């Protein structure tokens, strides 16, 4: 029997797909975004940039910025009855309006 893969990007065939016209890296402003502590952010994974990428199960979730570590932001995301702490690069974050 063959075992199914337990890799980081499994079951993400459609979730991490980019439109052909949007291929390549995003604009520099997405890399240089700044967020305040306490600000709400949406986690939207950028599949072309792998550093600081959160687990795909957090794609589309909303969290709160708690701090900064290096280039990444520390984001707390509610997951059921727990609060998960994630270290996410700003290219994978969008501010909540």
Swiss-Prot record:
Compositionally skewed regions (Basic residues) per UniProt: 1-24
BP GO terms, sorted: translation
Region (Disordered): 1-25
GO molecular function: structural constituent of ribosome
Keyword annotations of the record: Ribonucleoprotein, Ribosomal protein
Gene3D superfamilies assigned to the protein according to its UniProt record, in alphabetical order: Ribosomal protein L21
Keyword Disulfide bond: no
One term under GO cellular component: ribonucleoprotein complex
Record's signal peptide: none
Family designation: Belongs to the eukaryotic ribosomal protein eL21 family.
Protein name: Large ribosomal subunit protein eL21
UniProt organism field: Pyrococcus horikoshii (strain ATCC 700860 / DSM 12428 / JCM 9974 / NBRC 100139 / OT-3)
Upper taxonomic lineage: Archaea, Methanobacteriati, Methanobacteriota, Thermococci, Thermococcales
């Amino acid at each position: 029997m063959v075992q199914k893969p337990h890799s980081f990007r499994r079951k993400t065939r459609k979730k991490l797909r980019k439109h052909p016209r949007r291929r390549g890296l995003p604009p520099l402003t997405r890399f240089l975004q700044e967020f305040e502590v306490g600000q709400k952010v949406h986690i939207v994974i950028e599949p072309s940039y792998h550093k600081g990428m959160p687990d795909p199960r957090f794609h589309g979730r909303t969290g709160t910025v708690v701090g900064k570590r290096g280039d990444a932001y520390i984001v707390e995301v509610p997951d059921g009855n727990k609060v998960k702490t994630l270290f996410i690069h700003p290219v994978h974050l969008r501010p909540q309006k």
